[in-house]
């Protein structure tokens, strides 16, 4: 820092912003590691309450609509009504949706499309996030939910996001899967019990 005292003030501001961004990234990594550890060790408990799924999806779309618009990506919401209320941990399901939408935005090119979909299927609700991005190589699909695994050309984070998502969905008594064709896009889906 003493060496930087001689830099122009604009440069110092830029450097401090970079340090702050990296610090935030590291804090997120530490939080992800701690959260994943809690899930793996059975220490994470859900706070279950009635959860209006349609509202959850509308809000998730809203959180990412500006970013999608800036990237030139259509973020669509397709709901087959009526959707039942789930008995779920809303904050944890928001985390799952946010992670899936964020991943889709990172792996979808400009003028692409991301669809948030939800429908009832028997005694389950199926929620999916589907993009027409780069897709996932067939050889990588079997490992996609393992911790610290990253796929695709645009990597970021520690490779814990999808592993955390799967843990959260399983803790709700559901299951999570992926369907992808390289070069044609990816669909992550979760099946949650009513």
PLM segments and residue spans:
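Short alpha-helical segment of the dimerization/phosphotransfer core of two-component systems
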Residues: 21-26
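Short beta-strand/loop element within the Bergerat-fold HATPase_c
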Residues: 111-123
């Amino acid at each position: 820092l003493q060496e930087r005292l001689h830099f122009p003030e604009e440069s110092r501001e830029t450097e401090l912003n970079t340090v702050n961004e990296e610090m935030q990234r590291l804090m997120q990594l530490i939080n992800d590691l701690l959260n994943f550890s809690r899930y793996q060790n059975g220490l994470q408990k859900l706070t279950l309450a009635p959860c209006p799924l349609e509202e959850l999806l509308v809000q998730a779309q809203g959180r990412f609509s500006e970013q999608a618009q800036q990237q030139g990506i259509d973020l669509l919401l397709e709901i087959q009504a009526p959707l039942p209320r789930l008995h779920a941990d809303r904050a944890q399901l928001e985390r799952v949706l946010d992670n899936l939408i964020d991943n889709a935005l990172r792996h979808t090119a400009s003028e692409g499309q991301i669809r948030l979909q939800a429908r009832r299927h028997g005694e389950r609700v199926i929620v999916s996030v589907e993009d027409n991005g780069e897709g996932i190589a067939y050889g990588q699909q079997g490992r996609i939910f393992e911790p610290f695994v990253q796929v695709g050309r645009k990597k970021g984070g520690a490779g814990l996001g999808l592993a955390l998502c799967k843990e959260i969905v399983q803790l709700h008594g559901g299951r999570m899967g992926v369907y992808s064709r390289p070069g044609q896009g990816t669909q992550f889906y979760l099946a949650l019990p009513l």
